[in-house]
A protein has these predicted regions:
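Structural recognition of the beta-strand scaffold that forms the well-ordered cores
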Residues: 64, 73-75, 99-100, 120
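Glycine- and acidic-residue-biased ligand/ion/polar-headgroup-sensing regions
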Residues: 67-86, 96
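Ligand-binding loop in jelly-roll beta-barrel domains
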Residues: 89, 103-127
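Histidine-centered metal-chelating micro-motifs
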Residues: 61-63, 81, 98, 102-109
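A short beta-loop-beta micro-motif enriched in histidine and acidic residues
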Residues: 46-47, 60-74
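Short acidic-glycine-tyrosine-enriched beta hairpin
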Residues: 56-57, 86-103
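A short, N-terminal "cap"/entry segment at the start of jelly-roll beta-barrel domains
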Residues: 2-50, 91, 99, 129-135
């Protein structure tokens, strides 16, 4: 009976902490939207290309995260402050691009007064989440 109670308490604790983590991530991503446009297998086994449209409200923040592969992004509209670990922060505007190597922690903020729109292409490991929050 003690084991059943212990398992129940552990399960409830894990569920509560998991829910708090999801709420925290959602709050961090307020004003951020990623819409998948295309996904396709590559000629390299276990890899796929994913193309997404990203929209970030004025003053919106993309929390620090990683990808299981490379990211190449073109800024269609707006201005962003991009922070990529190991590099100086960059402020980029429409018409500019940035690249993030696989597994490198990065994030950003819309520093403009209008929504920012981006086109991002990811070359990632198939079957893994496209983005994982940084720890």
């Amino acid at each position: 009976m003690k084991n059943v109670k212990l398992i129940l308490v552990a399960t409830l604790t894990a569920a509560t902490l998991g829910a708090l983590g999801i709420q925290s991530l959602s709050a961090q991503q307020a004003g951020f939207k990623r819409v998948e446009l295309q996904r396709g297998d590559l000629s390299v086994a276990g890899r796929e290309a994913v193309v997404v449209r990203v929209e970030l409200d004025a003053d919106g923040i993309v929390g620090r995260h990683t990808h299981p592969g490379e990211e190449s992004t073109f800024i269609i509209e707006g201005s962003l402050l991009i922070e990529i670990n190991g590099k100086a922060p960059m402020t980029l505007s429409a018409g500019e691009t940035f690249f993030v190597p696989a597994g490198v922690i990065h994030g950003g903020k819309n520093v403009g007064k209008t929504p920012a729109k981006l086109l991002a292409t990811y070359i990632v490991e198939k079957g893994k989440p496209l983005a994982t929050p940084a720890k």
